[in-house]
Amino acid sequence: MGAEQVDAIVVGAGLAGSATAWALARRGRSVAVLEAFGPGHRRGSSHGTARIFRRAYPDPLYVRLTGAAHRLWRRLADEAGEEFVLRTGGLDYGPARQAEKMYDILRAHGVAAELMPAAAAAERWPGVVFGDDPVLFHPDAGVIDPERAMAAMRRLAAAAGAEIFYETAVVRLSATPGGAVVDAVGRSWRAPVVIVAAGPWLEPLLGGLVRLPPLAVEQVAAFHFAPLTPAWNGAPPTPTFIRYSEIVLYGVPAGRDGEAPGAIKVGEHGHGRITTGDDRDGIVDSAARERATAFVRDGLRGLDPAPVGELTCLYTSTASDDFILDRQGPFVICSACSGHGAKFAPLTGEIAADLACGGAPPDHRFTLAAHGR
C-alpha cells in the first residue's frame, strides 16, 4: 500500500505535539499525528496532573513568551469549555533566585508582582521556611493539568479533521524531493512537512537527517507529600514555589495524582540520571528521595515528610536550557523543552505550526544555529 498523503505529520502526541496538531488543524491543514504509545502514557515528559505555570524568569524573552502562552491557554479553555490552569500565585525564593532582578523584569513587562522581606512572606505563608533572602510573589502563577490539556487539544484537533494514531511507533523518517515520508509498522504517510515533537526520542528519529546539538535525557523524580492540616500554609490556594539554592526544588499542588487530599508535589529541577527514552527504568533514585524528604522536613512546616507517592519523568535538555524550535528542510524540530516547557505548550504548538507553514523562528536563540548547529 502506498503512503497516505497529508499536509503535515506530527510525530509525538505529548503536550507539544498535541498543541501543534490543534494549531495546524485550526488552520485547515490535514494532519496525521503519530504517537508511539497510548493516550495518557507515562513514558515521556508530559504525563500527570500538575506542572507549574509562571511568569517569573530572570530573562525578558521568557517573560514575554509566558504572556503569549497565557493568552493561548485562555483560548484553549474557551474552545474546550473547561479550565486547564488553576491560578494560585507563585513564590520564588532562596539565595540563588535573583528575586530582585525578576521583580524588576516582571514590572517592566507589566506583570503584577510583589517583592517582600522573608519575615513578611512567612506571615502570609507560614508553612514555608524562607530563610533570609527577599521573596518574590506573582499572582498569575498557577498549576497546569497536562493530562486534561492534551486530551482537549487532541479532541479539538480531531474535531477540525486531524487524525490521531496511537500505538504507532515511527521506524523511519526519509526526506524526499517534495517533503518527507514517515514509516510506521505496516503503514506510511507522506507530507510536505513533518513536525518532530518526540522529546527524548528526538535524536534517534532525526539524528541522521538533521545535525542536532548535544541533548541530555535525564530521568528525574518527584514526590507527593500530604498536609498534616488543611491550612498548613495559610489561606488557600497554596501557591506554587521554587527554592533556588545549591539544588533547585519546586513545589506545586499535586492535583488528581496526589494520592492524598491536598498533597503537594515536590521535586528537583534536574539532578536526574542520564538515560534514553527507551532505557529509562522508572526507578526513583534513593538520594533524590532523601533530599526531597529533608527539604520538606526542614523547609515546609505542616507537611508529613514521609512521601505518600513518587514518580519519574524525563527531561530532554539543551546545554543552554533554551528550546529548539526551527525548521531544516521538511523537518520542524519542536523539542528539548529542558524541564520548563509545559507552561509554553500551546505557544510551542503555534510556533511549530508557523514553521510548518513557512514562518520563521520566534527568536534566534531557538534556532539550530544558536545551538551550534
Residue ranges and their predicted role:
Residues V171-W189:
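Conserved beta-strand-loop-beta-strand element in the redox core of flavoprotein oxidoreductases
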Residues A50-R124, D132-D133, V248:
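Dinucleotide-binding Rossmann-like beta1-alpha1 core, especially the glycine-rich loop
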Residues W22-R26, E83-V85, S188, P200-G329:
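Active-site substrate-recognition segment that forms the wall
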Residues G2-A16, A32:
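Beta1/beta-strand and adjacent pyrophosphate-binding region of the FAD-binding site
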Residues A292-R373:
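C-terminal catalytic lobe of FAD-dependent flavoproteins
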Residues A25-S46:
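Glycine-rich FAD pyrophosphate-binding loop
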Residues I9-V11, L34, W189-W201, G349:
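Short hydrophobic core segments
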Residues P95-Y166, R172-T176:
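Flavin (FAD/FMN) cofactor-binding and adjacent substrate-gating region
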